[in-house]
């Protein structure tokens, strides 16, 4: 590498961000993923002074005193709280720029910071601006937006530049993004505001309705991860779920089965399936034929739900595969486009 390029690397910093409803990941060019934290901010009520961000804030969900509120700035894949999103981005970008030194830590200085942020496909111009502005206020000089399914497809290594169909289904915390991609462009896509959060909420509603048991988001997520599945498993499992009895208000433990949790998640899973089917139905015949051979690629945290690939393959008749590391797919995609400027401008909307 020339002296010029070494100096250029020191003067500029390129950052890719998967700004997710559930988690935020930050990729720094030539260094890889530097931040992987929950998209949660804890603040003092009244003053909105930030108390904690990320892992520390998530541990506070449902456990804060009256003076502190733990919030998730994004809902359904888009920004719900502008101020908190800006605070969170500032924290994560600062963390991505921080390096450990022998005598402490040091923030890497950069004359120019270029940021690529992944966003749901089909969001409005107002919603795009709501992403760009906090990123700029957090220190970015240039901000590019890339649609999440495109970023995920690039991240998992699909040959998107080929003249053939590639299908990606990215199931995040707030949205499910379905897209058919060919020649570096999205030919057909669908975004539904159903994701991991909706699965958690369906479990909360089920426990409340059937057992009069109130459980929190973290407990519901743990149940989903532990015994949740999209299809019948060889051996049904059980799990003790702790919560508050809605009748007498006392702590209570209920044993639930994987079959019950599968039933609880049936509605949001059906919505995800419908979005896949609609996208397939609207896909040009030649590209649809490609998908029979290439199959569907699953990415995002929701792809880790037990048996989801098997269930989707059964329901669509198309081979379905889970990405090697579905949680990192989008941020890896933002990282890859940062390495090629011409490609970056081709697959993203203009920087600001």
PLM feature spans:
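Nucleotide/phosphate-binding catalytic cleft detector across ATP-hydrolyzing
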Residues: 1-171, 179-297, 303-352
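Acidic, divalent-metal-coordinating active-site segment for phosphoryl/phosphodiester hydrolysis
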Residues: 174
């Amino acid at each position: 590498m020339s002296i010029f390029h070494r100096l250029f690397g020191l003067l500029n910093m390129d950052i890719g961000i998967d700004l997710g409803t559930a988690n935020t990941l930050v990729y720094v060019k030539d260094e890889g993923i530097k931040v992987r934290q929950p998209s949660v901010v804890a603040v003092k009520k009244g003053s909105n002074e930030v108390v904690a961000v990320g892992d520390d804030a998530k541990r506070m969900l449902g456990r804060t005193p009256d003076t502190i509120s733990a919030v998730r700035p994004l809902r359904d894949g888009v920004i719900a709280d502008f101020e908190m999103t800006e605070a969170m981005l500032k924290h994560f970008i600062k963390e991505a720029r921080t390096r450990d030194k022998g005598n402490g830590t040091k923030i890497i200085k950069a004359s120019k910071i270029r940021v690529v942020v992944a966003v749901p496909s089909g969001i409005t111009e107002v919603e795009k601006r709501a992403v760009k502005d906090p990123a700029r206020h957090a220190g970015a000089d240039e901000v590019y937006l890339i649609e999440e399914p495109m970023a995920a497809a690039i991240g998992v290594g699909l040959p998107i530049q080929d003249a053939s169909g590639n299908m990606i289904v990215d199931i995040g915390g707030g949205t499910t993004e379905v897209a058919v991609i060919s020649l570096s462009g999205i030919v057909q896509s669908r975004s539904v505001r159903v994701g991991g959060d909706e699965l958690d909420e369906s479990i909360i509603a089920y426990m409340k309705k059937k057992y009069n048991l109130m459980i929190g988001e973290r407990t519901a997520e743990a149940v989903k991860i532990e015994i949740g599945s999209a299809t019948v498993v060889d051996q049904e499992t059980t799990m003790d779920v702790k919560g508050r009895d809605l009748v007498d208000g006392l702590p209570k433990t209920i044993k639930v089965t994987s079959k019950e949790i599968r039933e609880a998640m049936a509605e949001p899973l059906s919505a995800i399936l419908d979005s896949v089917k609609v996208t397939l139905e609207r896909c040009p015949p030649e590209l649809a034929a490609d998908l029979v051979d290439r199959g569907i690629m699953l990415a995002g945290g929701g792809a880790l739900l037990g048996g989801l690939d098997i269930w989707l393959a059964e329901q669509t008749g198309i081979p379905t595969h889970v990405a090697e590391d579905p949680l990192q797919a989008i941020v890896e995609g933002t990282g890859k486009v940062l390495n090629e400027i011409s490609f970056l401008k081709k697959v993203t909307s203009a920087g600001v």
